């Protein structure tokens, strides 16, 4: 069996070409440029790299980014003040608070302070609830990117048994709800799940979203399954042991180059959508 490679890098590039045309049209029509504001608290090197990548993606499609860097000592109140300032800035169309924040900051409180119409990373409780009820909302960027990638390759989810390993509020939980909304039958597993291999073996579609390198072993996954790996760890490995799978599954996302590019691409797409709504 030759597995289909779900190439997120290629899909993101093709989408960027369309987004660039839409941004150009919007700028010509309104004289305004969509802006994504990114907030980085502290000096975590990985977080700084991710923020830089998001700014670069904005520029590739003709959008602007506003990079806000706050010191490690920032308090919850100070961060809330900055978020409220951005909420009230009509020139800003999307707000991203880079995860994680320092321990003294109430991350959930700060996420939920982001105005719903600027929550382009899909991190607020309100946004999650609206998405879950199939109401208009911006989806969490990584699971929404996964859904877009599967759709780009005509992967049908209706009636499939999807096993999501991981339950984080910005990945596992919204991923499960999006799959449920696509009429899949969903099983959620996590660190307290008993007999994890037995659940994984039942999956038509397996989503690794647990944040532990190669926790999900190749011999747990049945032939012909669709494998989505949302993890990335040093050495270019994900949450799933991909190597032995490539000649016996139906499709898989490579690591890197699968889910990651679609996460950033979805953030840019949703920022443009927000700009279109706000600028008219």
UniProtKB/Swiss-Prot annotation:
CDD domains given in the database record: NAD_bind_m-THF_DH_Cyclohyd
Keywords (A to Z) from UniProt: Amino-acid biosynthesis, Histidine biosynthesis, Hydrolase, Methionine biosynthesis, Multifunctional enzyme, NADP, One-carbon metabolism, Oxidoreductase, Purine biosynthesis
Subunit structure: Homodimer.
Gene3D superfamilies for this protein: Leucine Dehydrogenase, chain A, domain 1, NAD(P)-binding Rossmann-like Domain
Pathway listed: One-carbon metabolism; tetrahydrofolate interconversion
Family annotation (SUPFAM superfamilies): Aminoacid dehydrogenase-like, N-terminal domain, NAD(P)-binding Rossmann-fold domains
Function, in words: Catalyzes the oxidation of 5,10-methylenetetrahydrofolate to 5,10-methenyltetrahydrofolate and then the hydrolysis of 5,10-methenyltetrahydrofolate to 10-formyltetrahydrofolate.
Species annotation: Marinomonas sp. (strain MWYL1)
Disulfide partners: none
Protein name (record): Bifunctional protein FolD
Protein family per UniProt: Belongs to the tetrahydrofolate dehydrogenase/cyclohydrolase family.
GO-annotated biological processes: L-histidine biosynthetic process; methionine biosynthetic process; purine nucleotide biosynthetic process; tetrahydrofolate interconversion
Keyword Oxidoreductase applies: yes
Reaction equation(s) it catalyzes: (6R)-5,10-methylene-5,6,7,8-tetrahydrofolate + NADP(+) = (6R)-5,10-methenyltetrahydrofolate + NADPH; (6R)-5,10-methenyltetrahydrofolate + H2O = (6R)-10-formyltetrahydrofolate + H(+)
Single GO cellular component term: cytosol
């Amino acid at each position: 069996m030759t597995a289909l490679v779900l190439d997120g890098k290629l899909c993101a590039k093709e989408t960027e070409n369309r987004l660039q045309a839409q941004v150009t049209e919007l700028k010509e029509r309104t004289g305004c440029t969509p802006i994504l504001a990114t907030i980085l608290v502290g000096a975590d090197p990985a977080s700084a790299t991710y923020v830089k990548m998001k700014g670069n993606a904005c520029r590739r499609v003709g959008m602007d980014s506003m990079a806000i860097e706050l010191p490690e000592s920032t308090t919850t109140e100070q961060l809330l003040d900055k978020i409220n300032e951005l909420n009230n800035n009509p020139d800003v169309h999307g707000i991203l608070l880079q995860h994680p924040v320092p321990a003294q900051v109430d991350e959930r409180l700060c996420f939920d302070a982001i105005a719903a119409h600027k929550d382009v990373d899909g991190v607020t409780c309100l946004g999650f609830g609206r998405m879950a009820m199939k109401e208009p909302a911006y989806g969490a960027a990584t699971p929404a990117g996964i859904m877009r990638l599967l759709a780009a390759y005509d992967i049908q989810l209706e009636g499939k048994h999807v096993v999501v390993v991981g339950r984080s509020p910005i990945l596992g939980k919204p991923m499960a709800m999006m799959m449920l909304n696509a009429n899949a039958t969903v099983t959620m597993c996590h660190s307290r799940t008993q007999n994890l291999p037995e659940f994984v073996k039942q999956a038509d579609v397996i989503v690794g979203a647990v944040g532990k390198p190669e926790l999900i072993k190749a011999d747990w996954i049945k032939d012909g399954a669709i494998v989505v790996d949302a993890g990335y760890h040093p050495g270019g490995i994900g949450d799933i042991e991909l190597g032995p799978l490539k000649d016996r599954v139906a499709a898989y996302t490579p690591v890197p180059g699968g889910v990651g590019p679609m996460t950033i691409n979805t953030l840019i797409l949703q920022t443009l959508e927000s700009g279109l709504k706000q600028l008219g």
